[in-house]
Structures are given as structure tokens and as C-alpha cells.
């Protein structure tokens, strides 16, 4: 496929896996870069230095609210442990990333989280939306965000990002609705003379990522139930080379961009498409409209 591999290793807490360091040794031997998406609780100076030596580029932590909210979502003391881990990670020469999952629960706290990560010299900050696992969770007042509320949040955060553009923190515009927001502000323009059949940006499902579970099952996206094959496993499960999975019929389902109910009618189809995983959580369909997209088409 002529692709450059990059692994994101997550859990739970991947450090607790009995063969965690063996896996990293294999990646190091193959000169494959990787990121750990984990917890702060088992990080020490020695652990962070060992990660750096084995080729870890980045360690991602989660901050899902200010102290009270974050600890209620995670566990008591987690907020302070996370802040303490930032210095450990950066002190070992690793990049420290902070990821926030946005929902109705913490929507109003996100701007202050931005202030917090800048104060602590976090290298990379990004956020993504909560993917509900049931209809009840999708429409709950604790989790649901109205499209107008979400656009207002992006507007508030863009002003914060502009204020902090000379800080140590890079703000990753992870949510593809940023493209719509910047398009409306005139900061993103659709380039001329593009191939009409090429996807240039937006959701990377079936484009440049897959998820491999500990069982060997492969998902098109880690944020919703999307099985497309198995690399290994027991019993009667058929195992398939990764190339064949990525280019197989199950994966091709997620390349049918013309089937997207709302996005297919939008001029930003090849650049945005919102988050189909969030749409799946609401409607049990990858092709349903993004529930936080405010654009009328």
C-alpha cells in the first residue's frame, strides 16, 4: 500500500499489559513510531525515559473537565495525577498531548481546559465529541449538544486559539466540523481544479486508519462497532492479511461517500463529513447526518 505505519496503543492502561514492553521492543526493532494513549497512574521518570528510548513520540492523557467534573468521570484524584504526569512526560523528551471528550456534561468547561493546558505547556491539545452507545444516551441532557451550541463552542475556542497562537501548545483541529466553521469564516476555501472523485480531507475511516482489538478483530473505526475482519483469533474465525482487510468489501462500505444522507448534498463532502461515528451513535447508521452539524443543505 506504500503507507508509512504509525501505531496508537491504547487501553485501558496499556502499560499494565504483561507484554507491553515486548510489543514496544518489536516496534523499536522495526523503526515504527508510536503514541501511547493511556493513564497517568503508572508513569514514573524511569517509565517515561524507557518509552522515549524505544521510540515513543507522544503520550496522550485525558482531561474531561475541571477537577470536580473530571474526577467524577474518571476517579477521585485523577485530575491532579494527570497534571503531575505532564511534567514527567515532557521531562523525558516526549510530546505530551491532552485529549478532551466533549459532551453536554462538560461543554461549558472546555474554554477553561484550554487555559489549563496552555498554562502547563502541553504540546498538543485536541477534543472530540462523545459517541453515545444507545439512543437513550444520545438524547440525554447530560450528553447531547445542540448544533447551535456546538458552533458557539467552536467560535469561543477559535478566539482562545488565536489568543494562544504563540504559546507552547499546538491546537489540533481534530473535529471535522472545524472545516465547516473555517469555511463559513472565509478561512478555508475549496481549491480550484480538483479531481471530483478524490477525497481530500475529513473523516479518515477507510482512508488511513484501522483499529486492531486484542482479540485480533479489526474495526474500521475505534469509535463505533465496525468490524471488517480479523488478523488473528481462535475458533472458526477466518483470519485475513491486513492488506486484504483494508481493501476488502467490508471496508469498502465506509468509502461510499455518495450514500451519506446529508453530506452528499454539501460542497464540503470531500473535505469534512463531520463525524460519522457520532452519527452512528444517534441513528445506528454511518451515513446519517452528523447531529451537531448546523449547516442547512
Residue spans for each PLM region:
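Accessory C-terminal segments flanking Radical SAM cores
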Residues: 177-297
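Conserved alpha-helical substructure of the radical SAM core
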Residues: 1-57
Amino acid at each position: 500500500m506504500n503507507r508509512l505505519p504509525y501505531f496508537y496503543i491504547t487501553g485501558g492502561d496499556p502499560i499494565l499489559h504483561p507484554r507491553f514492553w515486548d510489543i514496544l521492543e518489536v516496534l523499536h526493532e522495526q523503526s515504527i513510531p508510536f503514541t501511547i494513549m493511556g493513564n497517568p497512574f503508572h508513569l514514573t521518570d524511569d517509565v517515561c525515559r524507557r518509552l522515549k528510548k524505544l521510540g515513543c513520540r507522544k503520550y496522550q492523557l485525558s482531561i474531561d473537565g475541571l477537577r470536580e467534573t473530571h474526577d467524577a468521570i474518571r476517579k477521585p484524584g485523577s485530575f491532579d495525577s494527570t497534571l503531575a504526569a505532564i511534567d514527567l512526560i515532557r521531562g523525558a523528551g516526549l510530546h505530551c498531548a491532552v485529549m478532551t471528550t466533549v459532551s453536554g456534561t462538560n461543554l461549558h468547561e472546555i474554554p477553561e481546559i484550554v487555559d489549563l493546558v496552555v498554562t502547563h505547556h502541553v504540546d498538543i491539545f485536541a477534543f472530540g465529541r462523545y459517541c453515545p452507545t444507545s439512543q437513550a444516551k444520545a438524547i440525554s441532557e447530560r450528553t447531547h449538544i445542540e448544533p447551535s451550541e456546538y458552533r458557539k463552542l467552536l467560535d469561543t475556542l477559535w478566539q482562545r486559539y488565536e489568543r494562544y497562537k504563540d504559546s507552547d501548545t499546538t491546537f489540533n483541529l481534530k473535529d471535522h466540523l472545524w472545516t465547516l466553521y473555517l469555511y463559513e469564516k472565509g478561512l478555508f476555501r475549496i481549491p480550484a481544479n480538483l479531481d471530483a472523485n478524490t477525497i481530500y480531507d475529513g473523516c479518515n475511516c477507510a482512508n488511513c486508519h484501522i483499529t486492531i482489538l486484542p482479540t485480533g478483530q479489526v474495526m474500521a473505526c475505534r469509535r463505533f462497532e465496525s468490524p471488517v475482519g480479523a488478523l488473528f483469533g481462535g475458533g472458526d474465525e477466518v483470519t485475513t492479511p491486513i492488506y486484504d482487510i483494508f481493501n476488502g468489501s467490508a471496508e469498502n462500505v465506509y468509502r461510499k461517500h455518495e450514500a451519506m444522507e446529508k453530506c452528499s448534498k454539501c460542497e464540503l463532502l470531500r473535505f469534512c463529513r463531520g463525524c460519522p461515528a457520532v452519527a452512528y451513535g444517534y441513528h445506528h447508521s454511518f451515513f446519517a447526518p452528523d447531529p451537531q452539524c448546523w449547516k442547512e443543505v
